[in-house]
């Protein structure tokens, strides 16, 4: 089953799904902007297109991730994103 989500007045949209090979995940696109997300479970985020500038909890500085690069976000945390151009991502929800 697909779940469509929209955040930040439509600037971030995602489609969530359950996959036998990777478990629960979502794919989405972020428009240019700055965003703060919270997590319940640990997440693995992979950039598909564009670039994401991310401030991960516990990291001393912002980091830039480009297509094919992955970052991890701890459970029950908050992370910040700066997006300079429309960017796509794959998010895997880890247990």
UniProtKB/Swiss-Prot annotation:
It catalyses: a purine D-ribonucleoside + phosphate = a purine nucleobase + alpha-D-ribose 1-phosphate; adenosine + phosphate = alpha-D-ribose 1-phosphate + adenine; cytidine + phosphate = cytosine + alpha-D-ribose 1-phosphate; guanosine + phosphate = alpha-D-ribose 1-phosphate + guanine. Its EC number is 2.4.2.1, 2.4.2.2. Gene3D superfamilies: Jelly Rolls (2.60.120.10). Keywords: Glycosyltransferase, Transferase. The keyword Glycosyltransferase applies. It comes from the Bacteria. InterPro entries: Ppnp, RmlC-like_jellyroll, RmlC_Cupin_sf. GO terms for molecular function: guanosine phosphorylase activity; purine-nucleoside phosphorylase activity; thymidine phosphorylase activity; uridine phosphorylase activity. One of its GO terms (cellular component) is cytosol. Catalyzes the phosphorolysis of diverse nucleosides, yielding D-ribose 1-phosphate and the respective free bases. Can use uridine, adenosine, guanosine, cytidine, thymidine, inosine and xanthosine as substrates. Also catalyzes the reverse reactions. Belongs to the nucleoside phosphorylase PpnP family. This is Pyrimidine/purine nucleoside phosphorylase.
């Amino acid at each position: 089953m697909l779940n469509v989500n929209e955040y930040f007045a439509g600037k971030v949209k995602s489609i969530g799904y359950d996959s036998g090979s990777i478990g629960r995940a979502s794919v989405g696109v972020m428009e240019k902007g700055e965003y703060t997300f919270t997590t319940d479970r640990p997440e693995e985020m992979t950039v598909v297109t564009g670039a994401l500038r991310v401030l991960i909890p516990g990291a001393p500085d912002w980091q830039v991730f480009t297509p094919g690069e992955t970052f991890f976000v701890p459970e029950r945390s908050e992370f910040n994103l700066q997006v300079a151009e429309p960017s796509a991502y794959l998010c895997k929800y880890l247990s």
